[in-house]
C-alpha cells in the first residue's frame, strides 16, 4: 500500500481501512500463536500499513484545522 494512494482517500475511507487492518493484525497474531505463520513478515507489513494510514489521517486533520 503506497502513501500516495492513501492521500486520495477520504478520512472516513481511511478509518474503515484502518479498522480492517487492525482486525487482520489481530487474526495474524492469533494464528501465529496457535499454528505459526508461513509468512511472518505479514505482521510487520500490516503494522506498517496501519502506521501509514494513521500518518495520512493526522496530516489530513491538521490540514483541515489550519
UniProtKB/Swiss-Prot annotation:
Query: Organism's domain of life?
Result: Bacteria
Q: Does the keyword Ribonucleoprotein apply?
A: yes
Entry's CDD domains?
Ribosomal_L29_HIP (cd00427)
Q: Name one GO molecular function term.
A: structural constituent of ribosome
Keyword annotations for this protein, in alphabetical order, are: Ribonucleoprotein, Ribosomal protein
GO annotations of cellular component type: cytosolic large ribosomal subunit
Q: Which Pfam family, any one, appears in the UniProt record?
A: Ribosomal_L29
**Could you tell me what this protein is called?**
Large ribosomal subunit protein uL29
Q: Which organism is it from?
A: Hydrogenobaculum sp. (strain Y04AAS1)
What is the phylogenetic placement of the source species in the record? Answer: Bacteria, Pseudomonadati, Aquificota, Aquificia, Aquificales
